[in-house]
């Protein structure tokens, strides 16, 4: 008879301990340390008994206000970046290669060109090459097909940067 009473009591106690640990962990009260009280709400005399408060509600309010501030800051940053990018559209379009160039690899360069995705337009066109393009340019320069001639041991690619 005693076993029938102790087993449900033990299971209930174990489940309540697990729920309590989960509650404390979700509120940041790990290792017996409670999270710090928010000084802005408690120092102005709005709440007199800090032990009776539901601190999770206070932290939700505090997180919400900081999230709103963060959203406003990110929106301002995004607007400034967009105005910087769209303000220099003339310079940005001047750096693009001409579509009617007679280069044999121009279609490959246009397909791998990252100018459409760049946030900050740069006047240096060679920064947006992929690693395969750079490898091909270096191997072509070493083979002697570069503008420096076949006899030169120095590739012309490194002088551009």
UniProtKB/Swiss-Prot annotation:
Propeptide residue span(s): 70-161
Assigned GO CC terms: extracellular region
Keyword match Ribonucleoprotein: no
Modified residues (Pyrrolidone carboxylic acid): 21
Listed GO MF terms: corazonin receptor binding; neuropeptide hormone activity
Asparagine amide modified-residue sites: 31
Record InterPro entries: Procorazonin
One Pfam family recorded for the sequence: Corazonin
Signal peptide as annotated in the record: 1-20
Annotated spans, Disordered: 93-125, 142-161
Cysteine disulfide links: none
Protein family per UniProt: Belongs to the corazonin family.
Functional summary from the UniProt entry: Cardioactive peptide. Corazonin is probably involved in the physiological regulation of the heart beat. Clock (Clk) and cycle (cyc) proteins negatively regulate Crz transcription in a cell-specific manner.
Protein's name according to its UniProt entry: Pro-corazonin
């Amino acid at each position: 008879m005693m076993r029938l009473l102790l087993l449900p009591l033990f299971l209930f106690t174990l489940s309540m301990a697990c729920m309590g640990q989960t509650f404390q962990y979700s509120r940041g009260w790990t290792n017996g340390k409670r999270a710090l009280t928010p000084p802005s709400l408690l120092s102005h005399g709005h709440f007199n008994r800090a032990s009776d408060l539901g601190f999770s509600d206070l932290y939700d309010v505090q997180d919400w206000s900081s999230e709103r501030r963060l959203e406003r800051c990110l929106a301002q940053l995004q607007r400034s970046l967009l105005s910087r990018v769209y303000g220099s559209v003339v310079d940005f379009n001047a750096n693009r290669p001409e579509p009617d160039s007679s280069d044999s690899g121009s279609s490959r360069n246009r397909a791998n060109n990252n100018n459409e995705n760049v946030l900050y337009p740069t006047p240096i066109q060679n920064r947006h090459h992929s690693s395969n393009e750079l490898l091909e340019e270096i191997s072509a320069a070493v083979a002697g097909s570069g503008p420096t001639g076949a006899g030169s041991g120095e590739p012309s690619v490194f002088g551009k940067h």
